[in-house]
Amino acid sequence: MKNSIISYPRIGANRELKFAIEKYFKNQSSKEELLKSAKDLRIRHWQEIQKAGIDFIPSNDFSLYDNVLDAAVLFNIVHTKYKNLNLDALDEYFAQSRGYQGENGDVTALAMKKWFNTNYHYLVPECDNADIIALTGDKIFKEYLEAKELGIESKPVLIGIFTLFKLIAFKDEKTQKLAKEKLLNAYIELFDKLNELKVTWLELDEPYLVYDLSKEDIALFEEFYQELLNHKKDLKILLQSYFGDLRDIYPKLLESKFDALGLDFIEGKQSLALIQKYGFAKDKILFAGLINGKNIYANDYAKSLKLIKELQKYTQNIVLNTSCSLLHVPYSTEFESKLDSSYLKLFAFAKEKLQELKDLKEILNSSEENPLFRANQELFKNIPERLDEKVKARLKALKKEDFTRTPSFKERALIQKEFLKLPLLPTTTIGSFPQSADVRSNRLAFKQEKISAQNYTEFNQQKIKECIQIQEEIGLDVLVHGEFERNDMVEYFGENLKGFLFTQNGWVQSYGTRCVKPPVIWGDVSRTKPITLAWSKFAQSLSQKIVKGMLTGPVTILNWSFPREDISLKESTEQIALAIRDEVLDLENAGIKIIQIDEAALREKLPLRKSDWHSEYLDWAIPAFNLVHSGVKAKTQIHTHMCYSEFSDILKEIDAMDADVISFEASRSNLSLLDTLKAIRFKTEVGPGVYDIHSPRVPSVEELSLTIEKILNKLPKEQIWINPDCGLKTRAYEEVIASLKNLVTATQKIREQL
């Protein structure tokens, strides 16, 4: 019995990659220094994986920004606008990820989307010229040879041709048609080069196969691989899937020329049933994904061994594997000195998951009952308390009317118009303002008890004053307090709710250099005291203008945390919803007229198969949001915000959330959402996001005016809000002020024309 992992976190044990790249972005280090830091990290990771006794060690899973972009660059799928900048390869790569504004030109970044049902974001490759598609990159070969120098025969990992092709945004059908042929030839050339290097195994990741596949999808997949696998020669090919099962194509895969199939037995609801029904091919190896790559709880070896024993009825050729890449979990629990050992023993981050794979291999390769098995089973005895009877009773007492807001949206809109007295095209921001080093160090000093609560509060109040003043000088209509007290929109609420646990170093990559530290939902959730009330009241006291109350919604808190596995996601979300509802009512009672409840991650846990959307997710996720705000008065305006996702196919459900205003992250996708909003007669007022905050470039007044005009061509002027597409926390003040001034100027210019 051997073991394997799909891929490993690339940010480093202490986010070394993030800091090295950011240093380069700030011109504080050279290209050579950045590339050396990256290589050092790769070497460290390989040695760690090797030391842990993993047989199939991945290479090419490392990335300076995003592995989808890496695959696109490998095959020269680069839009002409980036080529025309005439930058060197590394800076062209970063121009695609972040945009570019400088002496060589001014271009926006590639669109960013959620990676399937995770909180990782990938960059959408753009192809306007298929003629140039060819194997021009060498990253995959270089990194294989780097590992080889360490004495490691690695398994290069690459996104498969079918998934990559499906993720590319093509200029038109003609470009797409030519790209299909060119990309196939490029992958064939890749196979040839890997054969020349005498590579043993290549892992091709095809997560797109876990979606509902059409006949056309299956035909395209077969067309690609029937040709491609004829060129594999001595190269062994592992087809790796994750985030679901392969029910639409599994029987065909058994007859294919793949040497191994990687199946997900954590999220793949039908993976085992498919094997029980169709068996497994004698000429193939099964890479069994039984270590959860997306959650941080320790593996129960009894359950894993039971699964392996069942699989062994159908094949003896089994490799123990992770269910998906380990980049979705933190690096290691060894940096957690503050968490009580009674909790910590039940957690397994990436490094500990390597140990679990090693243990399981050893247990399966030994004949008698192994002490490793007994030690694992002991972990699950005497678990700390998770239940709260008061929370259970409150959930039980919920009635149907608790999930419905009255009066109707139409009636509320008239009442709010009279009450709020906002101009046409009201301007606002999404919530957070830049968090400079002094804001972060003030928060850290307070956490480490180096300063008093009074000092901490006074510092933040001064920052709020400055933030309100900046917004008033710029001329925004609805203000925010800036969220200087918050490290992260989810972690902050988790820290102030009962039922959550927190790590010191549990960082996970969200996109590029952005890392998040998800809380752990351990027990039943409740609010013991107001969370944001004092900050909101203070901010509102500073201005005659409306200052929004800012909260994170229950679905986002759930989706951006590591969830419990002992109760349903529905129950966990409803518990959080009741806690946030208490906060909403406190804000309203304090005179806060607009309350924003962000559901940035609503789409994130949407099942990948459409048939499961309602029964497994939307039927409880939307009501959970309704539960949060159903108790407010008609004159209180409820806002929500969503980002990084495609929403066009669930807009009716979003409308059913019954918020009064919703802001979307739509600027990176060229406002394509607007046509759907218009088509379905979306009732909620909308702020589509007029510029991309993930890029350091400052949009001009002309550019913003054109964007606003584009929105006005699609939606009634009474329905539109003008705002950036996301929070401003990660940007510098000079970019923010310049961008917002241009936003207000453009809006005023358009108002005059109306």
Curated annotation (Swiss-Prot):
One of its GO terms (molecular function) is 5-methyltetrahydropteroyltriglutamate-homocysteine S-methyltransferase activity. Its cofactor is Zn(2+). L-methionine binds at I430, G431, S432, E483, D598. L-homocysteine binds at I430, G431, S432, E483, D598. It catalyses: 5-methyltetrahydropteroyltri-L-glutamate + L-homocysteine = tetrahydropteroyltri-L-glutamate + L-methionine. Keywords: Amino-acid biosynthesis, Metal-binding, Methionine biosynthesis, Methyltransferase, Repeat, Transferase, Zinc. The active site is at H694 (proton donor). Gene3D superfamilies: 3.20.20.210. Its EC number is 2.1.1.14. Binds 1 zinc ion per subunit. 5-methyltetrahydropteroyltri-L-glutamate binds at R15, E16, L17, K18, K114, R514, C515, W560, E604. One of its GO terms (biological process) is methionine biosynthetic process. Zn(2+) binds at H641, C643, E665, C726. Pfam families: Meth_synt_1 (PF08267), Meth_synt_2 (PF01717). The keyword Methyltransferase applies. Pathway: Amino-acid biosynthesis; L-methionine biosynthesis via de novo pathway; L-methionine from L-homocysteine (MetE route): step 1/1. The keyword Amino-acid biosynthesis applies. It comes from the Bacteria. Transmembrane segments: none annotated. Catalyzes the transfer of a methyl group from 5-methyltetrahydrofolate to homocysteine resulting in methionine formation. PANTHER family: 5-METHYLTETRAHYDROPTEROYLTRIGLUTAMATE--HOMOCYSTEINE METHYLTRANSFERASE. Belongs to the vitamin-B12 independent methionine synthase family. This is 5-methyltetrahydropteroyltriglutamate--homocysteine methyltransferase.
